[in-house]
From Swiss-Prot:
Organism: Anopheles gambiae
Lineage summary: Eukaryota, Metazoa, Ecdysozoa, Arthropoda, Hexapoda
Membrane spanning stretches: none
Family the UniProt entry places it in: Belongs to the ubiquitin-conjugating enzyme family. FTS subfamily.
Protein name: Protein crossbronx homolog
Superkingdom to which the source organism belongs: Eukaryota
Domain UBC core: residue ranges: 14-168
Length: 228
Protein backbone atom coordinates (compact mmCIF):
# COMPACT_ATOMS: atom_id res chain seq x y z
CA UNK A 1 0.00 0.00 0.00
CA UNK A 2 1.48 3.35 -1.04
CA UNK A 3 1.92 6.32 1.26
CA UNK A 4 -0.82 8.16 -0.62
CA UNK A 5 -3.18 5.20 -0.15
CA UNK A 6 -2.31 5.09 3.56
CA UNK A 7 -3.08 8.78 3.90
CA UNK A 8 -6.45 8.33 2.21
CA UNK A 9 -7.27 5.34 4.42
CA UNK A 10 -6.36 7.31 7.56
CA UNK A 11 -8.45 10.25 6.36
CA UNK A 12 -11.45 7.95 5.78
CA UNK A 13 -11.04 6.34 9.22
CA UNK A 14 -10.87 9.74 10.91
CA UNK A 15 -13.91 10.94 9.00
CA UNK A 16 -15.92 7.87 9.99
CA UNK A 17 -14.90 8.40 13.61
CA UNK A 18 -16.03 12.04 13.49
CA UNK A 19 -19.38 11.09 11.96
CA UNK A 20 -19.91 8.41 14.62
CA UNK A 21 -18.91 10.88 17.35
CA UNK A 22 -21.42 13.37 15.96
CA UNK A 23 -24.14 10.73 16.07
CA UNK A 24 -23.14 9.57 19.55
CA UNK A 25 -23.41 13.12 20.83
CA UNK A 26 -27.12 13.18 19.99
CA UNK A 27 -27.69 10.74 22.85
CA UNK A 28 -26.49 13.23 25.46
CA UNK A 29 -28.60 16.16 24.28
CA UNK A 30 -32.20 16.94 25.21
CA UNK A 31 -33.87 16.07 21.92
CA UNK A 32 -37.18 14.80 23.23
CA UNK A 33 -39.44 13.65 20.43
CA UNK A 34 -36.67 13.48 17.81
CA UNK A 35 -35.30 10.17 16.53
CA UNK A 36 -32.40 9.94 14.10
CA UNK A 37 -30.43 7.07 12.60
CA UNK A 38 -27.79 6.92 9.85
CA UNK A 39 -28.62 5.03 6.68
CA UNK A 40 -27.32 1.47 6.46
CA UNK A 41 -26.19 2.07 2.90
CA UNK A 42 -24.80 5.60 3.16
CA UNK A 43 -23.19 7.19 6.25
CA UNK A 44 -23.75 10.63 4.75
CA UNK A 45 -27.53 10.18 4.79
CA UNK A 46 -29.44 10.15 8.07
CA UNK A 47 -33.14 9.45 8.60
CA UNK A 48 -35.11 11.40 11.17
CA UNK A 49 -38.58 11.69 12.66
CA UNK A 50 -39.86 14.43 14.94
CA UNK A 51 -42.94 14.08 17.13
CA UNK A 52 -44.06 17.65 17.77
CA UNK A 53 -45.26 18.01 21.35
CA UNK A 54 -46.41 21.63 21.48
CA UNK A 55 -47.10 24.71 19.40
CA UNK A 56 -48.95 25.14 16.12
CA UNK A 57 -47.66 21.84 14.72
CA UNK A 58 -48.51 19.81 17.84
CA UNK A 59 -49.20 16.11 17.20
CA UNK A 60 -47.45 16.25 13.84
CA UNK A 61 -45.09 13.36 13.07
CA UNK A 62 -42.75 14.67 10.41
CA UNK A 63 -40.11 12.63 8.62
CA UNK A 64 -36.92 14.27 7.39
CA UNK A 65 -33.46 13.42 6.12
CA UNK A 66 -30.08 14.95 6.85
CA UNK A 67 -27.57 14.88 4.00
CA UNK A 68 -23.95 15.43 5.02
CA UNK A 69 -21.38 16.94 2.62
CA UNK A 70 -18.75 14.51 1.33
CA UNK A 71 -16.02 16.19 3.39
CA UNK A 72 -18.11 16.53 6.57
CA UNK A 73 -17.28 17.90 9.06
CA UNK A 74 -14.25 19.56 7.48
CA UNK A 75 -16.35 21.55 5.05
CA UNK A 76 -18.04 24.93 5.39
CA UNK A 77 -21.04 23.53 3.49
CA UNK A 78 -24.00 23.13 5.84
CA UNK A 79 -25.73 19.71 5.93
CA UNK A 80 -29.14 19.70 4.24
CA UNK A 81 -32.29 19.03 6.25
CA UNK A 82 -35.15 18.01 3.96
CA UNK A 83 -38.63 17.08 5.15
CA UNK A 84 -40.16 14.04 3.51
CA UNK A 85 -43.50 14.96 5.06
CA UNK A 86 -45.38 18.01 3.79
CA UNK A 87 -44.66 20.85 6.22
CA UNK A 88 -46.45 24.14 5.59
CA UNK A 89 -43.91 26.55 7.05
CA UNK A 90 -42.32 29.83 5.87
CA UNK A 91 -38.82 28.32 6.11
CA UNK A 92 -39.57 25.01 4.37
CA UNK A 93 -39.37 24.98 0.59
CA UNK A 94 -42.69 23.55 -0.70
CA UNK A 95 -41.08 22.05 -3.81
CA UNK A 96 -38.40 19.87 -2.17
CA UNK A 97 -39.02 20.11 1.59
CA UNK A 98 -35.60 21.64 2.28
CA UNK A 99 -35.40 23.71 5.45
CA UNK A 100 -33.65 27.06 5.06
CA UNK A 101 -30.90 27.04 7.69
CA UNK A 102 -29.01 30.10 6.46
CA UNK A 103 -30.33 32.29 9.28
CA UNK A 104 -28.82 30.09 12.01
CA UNK A 105 -26.09 28.26 10.08
CA UNK A 106 -24.66 30.60 7.41
CA UNK A 107 -21.71 28.19 7.17
CA UNK A 108 -20.53 25.05 8.92
CA UNK A 109 -17.68 25.45 11.41
CA UNK A 110 -16.00 22.19 12.35
CA UNK A 111 -15.76 21.85 16.12
CA UNK A 112 -18.37 24.55 16.76
CA UNK A 113 -21.29 23.44 14.58
CA UNK A 114 -23.05 20.18 15.41
CA UNK A 115 -25.96 18.11 14.12
CA UNK A 116 -27.71 18.25 17.49
CA UNK A 117 -27.86 22.05 17.16
CA UNK A 118 -29.59 21.68 13.80
CA UNK A 119 -32.10 19.29 15.33
CA UNK A 120 -32.74 21.73 18.18
CA UNK A 121 -33.47 24.37 15.56
CA UNK A 122 -35.88 22.04 13.72
CA UNK A 123 -37.65 21.45 17.02
CA UNK A 124 -37.74 25.17 17.80
CA UNK A 125 -39.25 26.35 14.51
CA UNK A 126 -42.04 23.78 14.78
CA UNK A 127 -42.85 24.22 18.46
CA UNK A 128 -42.08 27.92 18.91
CA UNK A 129 -42.94 29.60 15.62
CA UNK A 130 -44.49 32.57 17.44
CA UNK A 131 -41.18 33.18 19.22
CA UNK A 132 -39.08 33.13 16.06
CA UNK A 133 -38.74 36.25 13.96
CA UNK A 134 -38.13 35.12 10.40
CA UNK A 135 -36.14 37.60 8.29
CA UNK A 136 -37.93 38.10 4.99
CA UNK A 137 -34.80 37.14 3.04
CA UNK A 138 -34.90 33.68 4.63
CA UNK A 139 -38.50 32.96 3.67
CA UNK A 140 -38.75 30.16 1.08
CA UNK A 141 -42.52 29.62 1.23
CA UNK A 142 -44.05 33.00 0.51
CA UNK A 143 -47.63 31.74 0.76
CA UNK A 144 -47.06 30.36 4.26
CA UNK A 145 -45.33 33.56 5.36
CA UNK A 146 -48.06 35.80 3.98
CA UNK A 147 -50.82 33.77 5.64
CA UNK A 148 -48.92 33.72 8.94
CA UNK A 149 -48.64 37.50 8.86
CA UNK A 150 -52.05 38.40 7.42
CA UNK A 151 -54.49 35.50 7.84
CA UNK A 152 -53.60 33.45 10.89
CA UNK A 153 -56.81 31.40 10.83
CA UNK A 154 -56.10 30.17 7.29
CA UNK A 155 -52.47 29.51 8.19
CA UNK A 156 -53.49 27.38 11.17
CA UNK A 157 -55.94 25.47 8.98
CA UNK A 158 -53.18 24.63 6.50
CA UNK A 159 -50.89 23.57 9.35
CA UNK A 160 -53.63 21.35 10.76
CA UNK A 161 -53.98 19.70 7.36
CA UNK A 162 -50.28 18.88 7.16
CA UNK A 163 -50.35 17.55 10.75
CA UNK A 164 -53.24 15.21 9.89
CA UNK A 165 -51.51 14.17 6.68
CA UNK A 166 -48.34 13.28 8.61
CA UNK A 167 -50.36 11.05 10.94
CA UNK A 168 -52.05 9.25 8.04
CA UNK A 169 -48.69 8.51 6.41
CA UNK A 170 -46.92 7.41 9.60
CA UNK A 171 -46.94 3.73 8.61
CA UNK A 172 -45.99 4.23 4.96
CA UNK A 173 -42.93 2.30 3.78
CA UNK A 174 -39.96 4.16 2.26
CA UNK A 175 -39.76 4.62 -1.50
CA UNK A 176 -36.21 3.21 -1.40
CA UNK A 177 -35.90 0.55 1.35
CA UNK A 178 -33.03 0.87 3.82
CA UNK A 179 -32.39 -1.47 6.75
CA UNK A 180 -32.05 1.47 9.13
CA UNK A 181 -35.06 3.44 7.91
CA UNK A 182 -37.30 4.34 10.85
CA UNK A 183 -40.51 2.34 10.43
CA UNK A 184 -43.59 2.18 12.63
CA UNK A 185 -46.04 -0.68 13.13
CA UNK A 186 -49.60 -0.45 14.31
CA UNK A 187 -50.10 -1.66 17.86
CA UNK A 188 -50.22 -5.44 18.07
CA UNK A 189 -51.23 -6.72 21.54
CA UNK A 190 -49.36 -10.01 21.06
CA UNK A 191 -46.12 -8.31 20.07
CA UNK A 192 -46.19 -4.97 21.84
CA UNK A 193 -48.39 -5.82 24.83
CA UNK A 194 -45.66 -7.45 26.97
CA UNK A 195 -43.28 -4.56 26.26
CA UNK A 196 -45.92 -2.01 27.21
CA UNK A 197 -46.69 -3.89 30.41
CA UNK A 198 -43.02 -4.11 31.38
CA UNK A 199 -42.67 -0.36 30.80
CA UNK A 200 -45.64 0.28 33.09
CA UNK A 201 -44.09 -1.96 35.73
CA UNK A 202 -40.63 -0.48 35.13
CA UNK A 203 -39.15 -3.90 34.43
CA UNK A 204 -36.44 -4.65 31.85
CA UNK A 205 -37.59 -6.61 28.80
CA UNK A 206 -35.63 -9.64 27.62
CA UNK A 207 -33.96 -8.95 24.30
CA UNK A 208 -34.32 -11.84 21.86
CA UNK A 209 -32.81 -10.19 18.79
CA UNK A 210 -29.11 -10.73 18.02
CA UNK A 211 -26.71 -7.97 19.09
CA UNK A 212 -26.01 -5.19 16.63
CA UNK A 213 -22.82 -5.34 14.62
CA UNK A 214 -22.30 -1.66 15.39
CA UNK A 215 -22.62 1.52 13.40
CA UNK A 216 -19.34 1.25 11.53
CA UNK A 217 -19.86 1.55 7.78
CA UNK A 218 -17.40 -1.22 6.92
CA UNK A 219 -18.75 -4.10 4.89
CA UNK A 220 -18.33 -7.52 6.47
CA UNK A 221 -15.11 -9.07 5.20
CA UNK A 222 -13.71 -5.70 4.10
CA UNK A 223 -11.37 -3.28 5.86
CA UNK A 224 -12.24 -0.19 3.86
CA UNK A 225 -13.97 2.49 5.98
CA UNK A 226 -17.18 3.95 4.56
CA UNK A 227 -17.38 0.97 2.19
CA UNK A 228 -21.11 0.31 2.59
Amino acid sequence: MTLDANDKLLEAVLQEYKILAEYERLQSEDLGGIYVTPSYENPFLWFGVIFVRSGMYKDGVFRFTISLPNRFPNDSTVPVVAFQSDVFHPMVNPSDGVLNLSDTFPKWQSGDSHIWQMLKFVQFILQNLDDHTIPSEHVVNNEAYQLLMENRAEFLLRVEQCVEDSQRKLYDLPAQPDRFYICFDRFNPDVHGPVLQSMKEDKPTEVTTPPSSGLSWVRKGFYQPLSK
